[in-house]
Swiss-Prot record:
Keywords: Cell inner membrane, Cell membrane, Membrane, Transmembrane, Transmembrane helix. HAMAP family: Modulator_MzrA. One of its GO terms (molecular function) is protein kinase binding. Belongs to the MzrA family. This is Modulator protein MzrA. The chain crosses the membrane at residues 11-31. It comes from Enterobacter sp. (strain 638). Interacts with EnvZ. Its main location: membrane. Residues 32-127 are periplasmic. It is a single-pass membrane protein.
C-alpha cells in the first residue's frame, strides 16, 4: 500500500493543527484558574490565629463561599475561587475580627504563573 505525497501532506497538516488546537485549549484553561488566598496572622508573636470555625461562620453568614481554611505555622490561609470573593471576605473579616490580626491577600505562585513570568521575562532578552 503506497500513500501519496498529497495524502501525507494533508495528514501532517491535520496533525499539526490538532496539536496547536490542543495547546491553545490547554493554555486557555490554565489561564482561567484565578484562585486567590487570604492570609490571617496575628500582629504580636505568641498570639494565636483565629478559630477556623469562627471564620467559616462569618463568611457563611455573609454568603461568601470559600474552598478551604487551613492553618499553616502561625498563619490561617483561606482559599477562594476568585479575587472578588477574596476581596469581599477581607471586608467582612476586617469588620468581624478583633484588632490584632493582619488580613492580607497572598499571591498564589501557581505553575502557570511561574511559567508565564518566565516566558515574559525571556522575551525581553531577545533583540
Amino acid at each position: 500500500m503506497v500513500i501519496s505525497p498529497l495524502a501525507l501532506r494533508r495528514l501532517s497538516y491535520g496533525l499539526i493543527a490538532l496539536v496547536l488546537l490542543s495547546a491553545l485549549i490547554l493554555v486557555w484553561t490554565a489561564l482561567q484558574r484565578q484562585e486567590s488566598t487570604l492570609a490571617i496572622r496575628p500582629v504580636s508573636q505568641g498570639a494565636s490565629v483565629p478559630d477556623g470555625f469562627y471564620i467559616w461562620h462569618h463568611l457563611d453568614a455573609n454568603g461568601i463561599q470559600f474552598k478551604s481554611i487551613t492553618p499553616q505555622d502561625d498563619v490561617l490561609l483561606i482559599k477562594f475561587d476568585s479575587s472578588a470573593q477574596s476581596a469581599a471576605a477581607k471586608v467582612v473579616l476586617d469588620r468581624s475580627l478583633p484588632r490584632g490580626y493582619i488580613i492580607a491577600l497572598q499571591d498564589d505562585q501557581s505553575q502557570t504563573a511561574v511559567w508565564l513570568t518566565r516566558l515574559r521575562d525571556t522575551s525581553h532578552r531577545f533583540g
